């Protein structure tokens, strides 16, 4: 890759997968899979385009738009659209690469992709966002379709933006099809879709707790980072299951519960309203229940049983990982994609090996936060059949998918990774190997490598 420009985020994601495969017996037992790794690491297609739009002052603005169609071995490309000034090809390649294996772990027939633009919706009016979405879809519509590529939302692309994008696609292509997921409930959306990533994350961790013989979420203290969609619904589900949530955060700092205080569903609802207005957590009125720590993430300020990073990539550093271990945390699962740095993962995995059943247990995002794309896949199925399932039906299917993802991550390392008696299986190794083998096998059957 030396002839290519540096892509640090993508290289981190690739190296994390490659090192897991190298440190297992997979290549020893199946040396041909080395070829598959080379092939799967290059996207099938990368689409890059300009997005020209007009602001409220009638001034021309231009942004870069992208769609990385990474792998379609298991089904149509599937992955979100992100609108954020930090969006670039490296970030989207990392997200798309992770998405391939995450989608494989759901058991649904969906491939992997990711897209977005370096557009910042903060400070923009509804009309400006609508005009941007229409211009963005003018080009994207040439490359997507219900059986080709089905984008969804991601950071700064919620129900409003999905609506604008869907309306633009319908007008341009003159057809109504399930080309986007995360749609409104009255026009093709699925119940539980907004909640799915957060709920699924908690369902996954519940299996970890149960497997470890520690009962359930009842009475557990939970630290959550972020205050967007994933963090909100993870917090609400934790509270519903009897846990105590003691932190949320945003890009400016962390809100930490003081003394015996904890977040209530009402608190989470008020924070959700602030976030809809794109306001900071500093605007949250709480009567002194919480302390806002500017410029800091929650991990070094809390003593908890469960840590759920739900904000963005690389939000748990080596030092923060060591702090969580020292304070007695037992479970960490990524609600965000690549939420932990590789150095942090190394800390957690070393503890797992050394302290066995007394260790902290780490679950990677490609398994733990697969609930969102899982329900997106269920939305695609409902659109294809022109039906809508009830909330209970979708929730039960989500629970089954998260249970299967956990069990796959649990059983796979027993075949490929040496472990001592009493040691928890490596969920990162199990998830990486299982997802990779499923995709590589399908690609081999299609003649993508030989």
Swiss-Prot record:
Keywords: NADP, Oxidoreductase
A GO biological process held by the record: glutamate biosynthetic process
Catalytic activity field: L-glutamate + NADP(+) + H2O = 2-oxoglutarate + NH4(+) + NADPH + H(+)
UniProt GO molecular function: glutamate dehydrogenase (NADP+) activity
A single Gene Ontology CC term: cytosol
Segments passing through the bilayer: none
Keyword Transmembrane helix part of the UniProt annotation: no
Gene3D superfamilies for this protein: Glutamate Dehydrogenase, chain A, domain 3 (1.10.285.10), Leucine Dehydrogenase, chain A, domain 1 (3.40.50.10860), NAD(P)-binding Rossmann-like Domain (3.40.50.720)
Organism superkingdom: Eukaryota
Broad EC category: oxidoreductase
Annotated EC: 1.4.1.4
Catalytic residues in the record: 114
Quaternary structure note: Homohexamer.
Family statement: Belongs to the Glu/Leu/Phe/Val dehydrogenases family.
Protein name: NADP-specific glutamate dehydrogenase
Originating organism: Botryotinia fuckeliana
Lineage, opening ranks: Eukaryota, Fungi, Dikarya, Ascomycota, Pezizomycotina
